[in-house]
Amino acid sequence: VEQKEIGRTYRYVAQELELKMEPVDPKQYVPRFASELELSEEVQSKANEIIDTTAEQGLLSGKSPTGYAAAAIYAASLLCNEKKTQREVADVAQVTEVTIRNRYQEQIEAMGIH
């Protein structure tokens, strides 16, 4: 069974049972991704800052929290000179490189970093 189908079924059951579902905070993924990529606390802190700043601007709406966190980790790794490739980050986060690229572009534009 595909992960997408499980998620869809979970949302359906939760809706039918009128369960309150809180949106997942992308910052919950930062420590795990950073640990698996052997990145520093500085990178984690910068990634959380990127998430906070860009989410305040409404960029998170409708986006996958895992992809969003992964892109923030990628951006933070570059900014802190602990470079990881999009492929490395995508593999750890189980998202595509295209997702990393798209969210990264949105985040750096929103942060005013070009």
Swiss-Prot record:
Molecular function per GO? TBP-class protein binding
Supply one GO CC term from the record: transcription preinitiation complex
Residue ranges of sequence repeats: 1-17, 28-109
Alphabetized, the UniProt keywords read:
Repeat, Transcription, Transcription regulation
Its BP terms in the Gene Ontology are: transcription preinitiation complex assembly
Q: Which cysteines are joined by disulfide bonds?
A: none
The record's Gene3D superfamilies line, in alphabetical order, gives: Cyclin-like (1.10.472.10)
What does this chain do? Stabilizes TBP binding to an archaeal box-A promoter. Also responsible for recruiting RNA polymerase II to the pre-initiation complex (DNA-TBP-TFIIB).
Q: Which family does it belong to?
A: Belongs to the TFIIB family.
Q: What is this protein called?
A: Transcription initiation factor IIB
Give the species this sequence originates from.
Answer: Haloarcula vallismortis (Halobacterium vallismortis)
Its ancestry begins with: Archaea, Methanobacteriati, Methanobacteriota, Stenosarchaea group, Halobacteria
